[in-house]
């Protein structure tokens, strides 16, 4: 029983982020381990905005993975910033 509680607590801290990228702003969503929406926030598409976005996601728990649209275009800088922080980045198809 104790192991189940410990695993549940660890799981509750695992956060997944998703980012819809645009030229001027990126819209981020934070999801719990079951896909429940924890929050949505808009950030400027500049290095200071990337840092704020990652800090915001981290406020929900340990960020394990971030799915980003357009890692080769509008999301390229953000993808590099998040990868440099040691967080796995996954390309999300725009369709």
For each of these PLM feature ranges, what is it?
Residues 1-95:
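Phosphate- and other anionic-substrate recognition elements at nucleic-acid/protein interfaces
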